[in-house]
Regions:
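Electrostatic cytochrome c docking/interface patches
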Residues: 25-27, 31-73, 88-91, 148-170, ...
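Axial heme c-ligation environment in periplasmic c-type cytochrome domains
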Residues: 1-33, 88-94, 110-141, 156-160, ...
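Conserved functional loop/turn residues at catalytic and ligand-binding sites
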Residues: 80-83, 99, 126, 177-180, ...
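The feature marks the first
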Residues: 57, 66-112
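Sequence context surrounding c-type heme c attachment/ligation sites in exported
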Residues: 70-77, 97-100, 104, 167-174, ...
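The canonical Cys-X-X-Cys-His
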Residues: 17, 21, 69, 76-82, ...
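Mature, folded catalytic cores of secreted/periplasmic enzymes
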Residues: 1, 79, 96-99, 105, ...
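Sequence context of c-type cytochrome heme-c attachment sites
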Residues: 1, 56-59, 81, 127
């Protein structure tokens, strides 16, 4: 009976998300987003070309100071790189191009312990003490603002996923992350464009296994977990990741 109940829970979650998105205007379109000018002095997202692939660099919307964040970011360089491109050898994702609001939420999550506190989350546990070097919410806002100024190159595919098969699976993701994969702040859905395929797969595995998205304070993670359960196995996850990479073009 338990698998049946889980299947119903997953479908209900999908229906709820779809209904919420549809409530915006009847067409399913999300409301227009308002961008706040950060201390870095830029409000508009910019695009950079990396190896023939256009990647959007998110605008800073945290209200933080990118200048102050630059000094704080020195702690992050060893793993994420000076340009925020990440490092697979260190299991560090690309953070360049990510939205300030999402970076802020995740850093707060690590610091509060609802992300990176489970023994199974080895790499999350490595990140948690890093978040604790940030004294307060202002420091988090500052470093998030600085990261939005980075434009580290995206990584090529590393897995053998099938993008065509992943396209069909991605329909579940469209309501929150968008057909273009760029996310939606109103739905607390991050930008997926530019993330490495291995990182996408690992996070889907973590959500499905309950390593992520089960803490009572992780409201947004709880929304994502049933979505991960729609993917039958690791192959399906690799296929979705391959399709997400194809959205860069």
């Amino acid at each position: 009976m338990r698998p049946m109940a889980m299947a119903l829970a997953v479908q209900e979650a999908i229906n709820n998300v779809s209904a919420y998105v549809a409530s915006f205007d009847g067409s399913g379109a999300a409301p227009a987003m308002t961008t706040t000018v950060a201390a870095s002095g830029t409000a508009d997202a910019t695009s950079t070309d990396t190896g023939g692939q256009a990647v959007t660099v998110a605008a800073a919307t945290s209200g933080g100071s990118a200048e102050a964040g630059a000094a704080l970011y020195t702690t992050c360089i060893a793993c994420h790189g000076a340009d925020g491109a990440g490092n697979q050898a260190l299991n560090s994702p690309r953070i360049a191009g990510q939205s300030a609001w999402y970076l802020t939420n995740q850093l707060k999550g690590f610091k509060a312990g609802y992300r990176g506190s489970k023994p199974e989350d080895i790499y999350g546990m490595q990140m948690r003490p890093m978040s604790m070097t940030l004294a307060d919410d202002q420091a988090i806002a500052n470093i998030a603002a600085y990261i939005t100024t980075l434009n580290g190159a995206v990584s090529p595919a590393t897995l053998d996923g099938n993008a065509e098969a992943g396209k069909g699976l991605y329909v579940t993701c469209v309501a929150c992350h968008g057909a273009d994969g760029k996310g939606n702040e109103a739905l607390k859905s991050p930008n997926l464009i530019g993330l490495q395929d291995w990182y996408v797969v690992r996070q889907l595995q973590n959500f499905k296994a309950g390593i992520r998205g089960t803490h009572p304070e992780d409201i947004n993670g709880q929304t994502m977990r049933p979505m991960s359960m729609t993917l039958a196995d690791d192959k399906a996850m690799k296929d979705v990741a391959a399709y997400i990479i194809s959205l860069r073009k």
